[in-house]
A protein has these predicted regions:
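Catalytic phosphate/metal-binding cores of nucleic-acid and nucleotide-processing enzymes, i.e., regions
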Residues: 1-126
Length: 126
């Protein structure tokens, strides 16, 4: 749990440095919905839901479902492990780039193959 919290702090620090708005969501508690991504982020008008996992963490079926629903809705649902943090940073840099448009996002097919864990099927991201 400490490893995931340290990773979360690293991700939040990076997002703050990029000028992204984000909130930490504590799901599964009283009056909260389970399966919602850990971080709900807005970068340059783009919605990004980030489910953080430590190196050996495994997402629940509900977390996977919710990430896929975010992607189907036109947002970015991301299952993020520490070893993919550099690719995540590249995505956020693209989203926060002042002249980013659909063309620059569609040019990043690299992410689909190299960014996402095979446990999550993500369609129409890049």
């Amino acid at each position: 749990m400490a490893a995931e919290k340290n990773f979360e702090n690293k991700v939040k620090k990076f997002l703050k440095e990029q000028g992204c708005y984000f909130i930490k969501y504590w799901g599964g508690g009283a009056f909260t919905k389970s399966g919602v991504p850990d971080l709900l982020v807005c970068c340059n008008g783009y919605f990004v839901g980030v489910e953080l996992k430590a190196e050996n963490g495994k997402p629940s079926e509900l977390q996977i479902h919710n990430l896929n629903e975010i992607n189907k809705s036109g947002g970015y649902g991301i299952l993020l492990y520490p070893e993919k943090f550099n690719q995540f940073k590249q995505l956020i840099w693209l989203l926060t780039y002042p002249f980013c448009n659909d063309e620059c996002l569609n040019a990043t097919d690299y992410f689909q193959e190299n960014f996402y864990n095979q446990q999550v099927i993500i369609n129409d991201i890049f």
